[in-house]
Amino acid sequence: MSSPLIFVLIVISILIIFLKYIEPMINKYKLKNDNEYGSARFSTIYEIKRNFKKENLSNIKRVGVPIYYSKNIKYVWFDTETPHYIYLGSSGSGKSVTAVIPMVTFLANAKEKRSVFITDPKGEIFHNTSKMLKDNGYNILTIDFRNPCLSNHINILESIICEYEKYIEYEKLLKNTNDKEKQKEYNNISLSHYAESNRLISSLAEIIMQEKVEGKDPFWNNSARNLLEGLISFFLEEYKEGKIKREQITMTSIRKFQTSMMNDKNERKFKILMEQKPYGTKSKDTLTPLLSMNENTYKSVTGVFNEKMAIFDDINVANITAQSDFELNILGRKPTALFIIVPDEDKVYYTLVTIIIGLIYKELVKLANKNTVKKLDIEIDWLLDEFANCPPIADIESVVSVSRSRGMRFHFFIQSFAQLDNVYGKEVSQIILDNCGLIYLKTNTMDTAEAVSKRLGKQTIESSSISQSIQTISYNGNQSTSLMARELLTPDEVKSLHYKTIIFPNVGYPIFRDTVIFNKINCYKLGEVIREIRPLKNLTSTYYTIDAMNSKKENSSLTSNNDFSEFQQMEKQILQEGIDTIKNILHNKIEKIEYKELNMRTYVLITLKDKVETKNKSIIKGKINNKKYHLEFNNIGNKSLIELHLKSLI
């Protein structure tokens, strides 16, 4: 081979090497901004170890959300800074075995004890972790609607009753002292407890009657809420007067009382009872506008009320909520694990979950506010599985915004973003998301996969193209390198992930790691606490209904040819005031006074000896309570008849 030919081949080889390897490197260096179309990436191991707290699983000091595990799963890095987390996993994604049970395991074994509230639809978490928690010093409680005979008890009205009893106690002290300074002190304390009981009543009624964001006209739910507030207040007033026992103040008893109002006779009786109460009484002030509604409107309100309260007809629910055997704020005073076990095949029970969450949260806020630092002595994690299957938690925006500062951390488990939107609406859902980190486990829907892909963001990648032509005596070639955007993970890639977890903390880039199942964690111990059997009771005797009310019967000088029913006797008591007014004006001009009945309403017919004088007629009209009574004057021969009717009782 001649030297010129060898030289040509060497030159061509150098050009090819240059074009294929060296020029792309030069072009890459020349690119001005390799983040031009996006800078998304996953955190590096170095960044994870720098940003999060490392703990030895054999000696855990303080628990956060597990972000990363060492290969041998002897060490874990916790996120202790992100206030709350949303766990996104469709049905069958392994939320319990990869997220809930590991979290409970860490809490049980940590030196710094935190209480834990767990919604546990299948009872799976209780079965797998309760003994481990107990062995590590935890108080174990269950509210078990699957097995009510094994459940603890929680009277939903207990906090309200306790507050009202303090009001009664200090009111009695006020009446029994002549010391002016003590009177001021007792008066202020009494009224503060009364105000707090009213606040708790309003809060509970709001929790129970809360409607989804795209629900009915708010008028109906607000009216049903007022009905519940009024009935709770009525029960407390009856308790104060000694007419009912403490054990009769339950949600089921209130439900039965309202049911007993469904027939016309009992409804009228209750209206008369309200008429007798003084204005300023909580029950009267709340119920008066409702009982004065027209019949159709009132029936619609009671329809909403009955729909929301129907759950308390359930015998299991009635037994569990008939009394309380623990204090709601115990979770903020002593390391406690409370499991809420509900039949997940019947979503109506999730209403009770929302109610219990709201009650305990309110009690823990009160407890935290008593501390100088406004924080719980024993902090708490809320592990809320099937969160978006529950009716909305009232004022959830405030909960996620301020609960961290009080020592409360929430873990919300949902199946999709759409599920959250359906319960809270897009605006409130976004507030929840803005206050939470996100842990992605698995999805079956493309919409959710697209949302996760979008949240991960885009990265900038290179795109190279080469065109070349080689001839015997010449070479023509061209290579170009450009930048373009690509999703860090496409929706299809997100959807196809298997046993992988993506975590979006508030600090740093997203984290991509293998999913760890609880039985791989060396500090986990299997075991279930044996619970005491509590036989169910027939609670019929504890219900307070209108039929069971004992009305006061007073003597009267009026004559009657009829044997008046208890209801008519109550009407008679109200009519007596008007009769006395007329008697004081007409004195000895009355011949007789009789009770009559018209359209099942009692009225009084007063027969005078003579015709009533115009002057006396004017005086009677001026003195009689025209808001309560309606007068009719008629003449028959030389005598006058006065009819005294009750107006609408409420």
Residue ranges and their predicted role:
Residues 588-602:
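Short edge beta-strands and adjacent turn/loop segments
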Residues 568-579, 583-587, 591, 621, ...:
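Residue-level detector of alpha-helical secondary structure
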Residues 1-93, 97-105, 110-112, 469, ...:
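Basic- and hydrophobic-enriched, low-structure N-terminal and domain-boundary segments
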Residues 400-402, 406-503:
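Conserved ATP-driven motor cores of ASCE-family P-loop NTPases powering translocation/secretion/packaging/pilus
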Residues 186, 604-606, 620-622:
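Short linear proline/tyrosine/threonine-rich motifs used for host-factor recruitment
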Residues 132-134, 330-332, 429-434, 622-625:
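Short, conserved catalytic or adaptor-binding loops enriched in Gly and charged residues
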